[in-house]
Amino acid sequence: WYLSQEISRRTKNMSRIYAEVGRHAKAVSGGLKTMISPYIHGIKTDQVMAGDKALSVEEHRREWNEILGNVAGAVDILAFQDGQVDYHELYDYLVVNKALADKYGMECWTNIESFDRDMPIKFLPIKFDKLRMKLEAARRAGYDRPSRSNFRIS
C-alpha cells in the first residue's frame, strides 16, 4: 500500500491519521506492507523558495523522529524524495533517514527524482551525472533499494 498524502513538519499531526490508515490497510490486506514517500523540507521546496526557512539536518532528524514514532508499526517502508535538498547536503539527509528508519524497524528506500529542480523550467529530465551522484550518495549511506519519481507533463 502506498499512503500518498505527503506529510511534513507543517502537517505532522497527520501522522496519527497515517497510522490509522496504515493499520487499516494492513488489516484488510492480510498484512501487506505500507509505504510513505515524504519530502525533505530543504532548500528546493516551494515553501523555501517563497521565503520559508529550510530545515537543517538536525531539525529534520528531530521532526521526523517524532513523526516516525507516531507511525511506527503502521508504516513499513520509508522512501524520502531526494529532490528537495542541494546535492552537497543529500548524503547527510540520507544518513539521518536511514538511521530513523532503522530505529523504527522500517525499510528505507530513497525516492530518486529523475527530473531537475535546478532548472527554471520545471521539470526537465535530470542529467545523468546528477542521477549518478544521487545513486552514489544513497549507496554510501547504506541504501540498497532506490525507487524513482517521474512526472509526465502533457
Describe the function of each predicted region.
Residues 2-154:
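Glycan-processing catalytic domains of CAZymes
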